[in-house]
Amino acid sequence: MSAFVGKYADELIKNAKYIATPGKGILAADESTGTIGKRLASINVENIEANRQALRELLFTSPNALQYLSGVILFEETLYQKSSEGKPFVEILQENNVIPGIKVDKGVVELAGTDGETTTQGFDSLGARCQQYYKAGARFAKWRAVLKIGPNEPSELSIQQNAQGLARYAIICQENGLVLFVEPEILTDGSHDIAKCAAVTETVLAACYKALNDQHVLLEGTLLKPNMVTPGSDSPKVSPEVIGEYTVNALRRTVPAAVPGIVFLSGGQSEEQATLNLNAMNKFDVVKPWTLSFSFGRALQQSTLKTWSGKKENVGKAQDVFLARCKANSEATLGKYGGGSGTGLASESLHVKDYKY
């Protein structure tokens, strides 16, 4: 029995289980103002609130796309925004059986005593902010920790600091009614092979779940948002089947069965590659006590963004592209994706070194 004593236990378990519904996944639309500015700049669109709102409205009102989503991660600005018709985005999502979530961290800062490793900030007034987000309709939260693989990295200090930070955030969120996404992202930057990534992933996840248990976090009211286990960005590529096997094995060794779902970040992979890898994991024939799904940002939005290009007349076409990507990833969560949605834009790599958002 969990030592969790918060009043929201039943609600947390119910919401986490729903988010992990097979066939559904997460749209990560929580880019900071600076990061979405870079995305808009790539299509020559000015970074003003009206344009940020227009992009989010395009996504949230795409006909038939939301049936493939169980949650959407929002940035604070977006949590309070409305559609052009005056309807709050939160209501639009809720009416389509999509749970709104919120990014609660404030980005990373350098961890003193390390060679450029980082820790995540955002604990100031976190409890009060969670209360406000809950009142606004959010029912889950995301906190991103970032680790890197290098000659001596991640250091033990970095692993422990980030694990303890994730656990501290987790219990504060749960005490205020928010399911938490635990996101210890190991960057793909580097020339390491897939076995090295697997070993580091296992070490980091083991530390995270030790810290979560020490903080009496209710695991049934959490989801894990990890990196896929892949070779470094400067290493030779391997097949989706190899990535699927290494990833699932690493998770089976470290993630308790009490966790209802694991939703992967795309980590700069192309849209199509991320989908193929997710499909391979779900086809890998071993016992998996949790659902394996997606929590993609760039890998759901990039070709949609390019198709839209900030023009009203392109909204319909862009929404069709978004629907196709949502459907493809839904199929991948069931191990039923046959490929073929990756022509053109969907095959472009989205890797950004030392990615921050």
From Swiss-Prot:
InterPro entries reported in the protein's UniProt record: Aldolase_I_AS, Aldolase_TIM, FBA_I
PROSITE patterns: ALDOLASE_CLASS_I (PS00158)
A cellular component annotation (GO) from this entry: cytoplasm
Domain of life: Eukaryota
Subcellular location: Cytoplasm
Example GO BP: glycolytic process
Predominant localisation class: cytoplasm
EC main group: lyase
One protein family per Pfam: Glycolytic
Catalytic activity from the UniProt record: beta-D-fructose 1,6-bisphosphate = D-glyceraldehyde 3-phosphate + dihydroxyacetone phosphate
Coiled-coil positions: none
UniProt site (Necessary for preference for fructose 1,6-bisphosphate over fructose 1-phosphate): Y357
Keyword terms, alphabetized: Cytoplasm, Glycolysis, Lyase, Schiff base
Residue numbers annotated as active site: E183 (proton acceptor), K225 (schiff-base intermediate with dihydroxyacetone-p)
Residues holding substrate: R52, K142
Family, per entry: Belongs to the class I fructose-bisphosphate aldolase family.
Protein's name in the database: Fructose-bisphosphate aldolase, cytoplasmic isozyme 1
